[in-house]
């Protein structure tokens, strides 16, 4: 089936850790990459909607899901091959050969939003169709980052919660400005949509002592990634779909397991 695909390599800073964010590049089509939005622009909440995400089901294309690096295309495809609802979903393709190693590679969706109040819940669905583990630290997660938060201590440029969904059972690295909460510790199930949800407001209250207030923006990432890959071990491959993503009040959550 002919499909347009998106590939890139990029570099970003998350908190105090520096990661290489890259996506394998191959030329499987003659038409070139799909036109897509650029670097992230923080979004005002959609009017009249509880969901703070714009285009949560990718039915309107790729935007405003974005890139963390200037002049590069967001590292995902809008796919019509599989969808939890509607016709589209976001597809992250990991293709890293065995001979390649490195500290980290992250394949991600990201959106930045500027609500007045910190949201309560994140929910959504993921689906894994291909999973070849190239390192023990290959996993799915979503990450919530609040920037310029005056009411949380210690003072950092941002404060994070990280939520591994599948693939690892221990924290993959130490990071001073983040806490890990595991929503799953097993290898990902393949060939089925898996529901996830978490009350992120309660987690910030529990781990950071309060829900963020007065922040400049929120950044939310949905990822497949690895850390600490040794060259020559095994190829790291994954096809991961995300769909029907929600962030807002728990009472208005449209997703049900």
What are these regions (language model features)?
Residues 1-12:
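Bacterial N-terminal signal peptides that target proteins for export
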Residues 21-24:
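C-terminal motif of bacterial Sec signal peptides marking the signal peptidase cleavage site
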Residues 27-72, 256-257:
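Extracellular carbohydrate-recognition regions
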Residues 58, 107-147, 197-200, 244-245:
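Extra-cytoplasmic beta-strand recognition segments
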Residues 58, 124, 141-143, 190-236:
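Extracellular beta-strand ligand-recognition surfaces/modules
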Residues 58-94:
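Extracellular glycan-recognition surfaces and repeat-rich motifs
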Residues 92-117, 121, 173-183:
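Secreted extracellular polysaccharide-interacting domains
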Residues 128-189, 241:
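Extracellular ligand-binding interfaces
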